Amino acid sequence: MTHSPIDVLRMALEREKDAVQYYKEYATGASEPAIREMFQFLVAEEVKHVELLQAEIDREVNQEN
């Protein structure tokens, strides 16, 4: 099965969103401040990835129309 570039971007976007939720859960459950901060940092990084992928998807969709 072949996937279009936009399909691949959408799959990547979903994985990044999953990672955000995963790290948020661990940040919330962390009892040590250093561990909590590390997971909060990872959440922020994943949010950046979500934003970049969403912007690229939006560009691709606009080019198709």
Regions picked out by a protein language model, each given a short descriptive name:
Residues 1-65:
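Non-heme di-metal
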